[in-house]
Amino acid sequence: MSEQTALEQKLWEGIVQYPEEFVEKYIAKGYWIGQTLSDFFIECAKKYAQNTAIICGERHFSYVQLQQHIDEFAVYLSKQGYQIGDSVVIQLPNIAEFFIAYFGALRIGMRPIMSLPAHRHAEVSHFIGQTQAKLYICADRFMGFDYRKLALECKQRCESLQQVLVVGDSGEISGFTTWPDLSKYQQQRVVPPNLTARHVAFFQLSGGSTGTPKLIPRTHDDYLYSVRASAVICELNQATKMLMVLPVAHNFSMSSAGSLGLFYAGGT
């Protein structure tokens, strides 16, 4: 078995692919354009370079600045040994680091699992176990809850989990790392992974169901069609300002038209 064949098997394990006739129709109609989410934001950063992408408290990030941080975080992840197809659980509040972590992980072919701030041990440990996630990114504290305690429980019980990356104070717990100084990686870049827009980009979570949320695989192609169409329907443009109140990792907050739709239009 070739290395590429083995990688494809890993990437599609447990995933039901779109029927080929559907794929051909979506491509023919222009719904799917073969763009990855990573390349999507790179294009946004080129098109709207000096526009303000995010205001996070007192911090303002232009599109080009946000892309710079994404590139730097991708280098950091690569230097930690993460590879194409590795899973990462991201559980962060509505802060800039969420987008840096999300797009940085996608940049090297990792697959984020979009955990919400309200999730606790039962949910997070399930996400880690189901995907064999190697990395868990969380805040130190948010809304009175200490995520480091949750992370420690997961680290002790989930064999696949290699690292906990904390935005804030990591508490000097063994196996925990504080969010890196990204300026150390300014002059470095990663080699883009050998992935197509038809591959699974990340996993979102089912809503309204009973029990533990189910993982929903989203491909680059299918997700970006929703983003582009929603941005047009909502008539977003470069003058649009969006106050993000709902959890940023939620599907509605990301793509309906959400933050990604806003990026597509060049808004803030």
Predicted regions located by residue number:
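Conserved pre-ATP/AMP-binding loop-to-beta segment of ANL
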Residues: A49, S183-G207, T212, P217-D221, ...
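Structural core segment of the AMP-binding/adenylate-forming
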Residues: M1-E8, M110-P180
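A short helix-loop-beta submotif of the ANL/AMP-binding
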Residues: P93-I113, P117-H121, G129-L135, T240-K241, ...
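Flexible, non-catalytic linker and terminal segments flanking ANL/adenylate-forming cores
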Residues: M1-G34
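Flexible, low-complexity linker/hinge segments
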Residues: K25-Q35, I173-V200
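AMP-dependent adenylate-forming
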Residues: E13-E24, D39-S62, V167-S174, F203
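Conserved AMP-binding/adenylation subdomain of ANL enzymes
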Residues: L224-K241, N251-T268
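Conserved AMP-binding/adenylate-forming core of the ANL superfamily
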Residues: Y31-I42, Q50-I95, F99-F103, R120-S125, ...
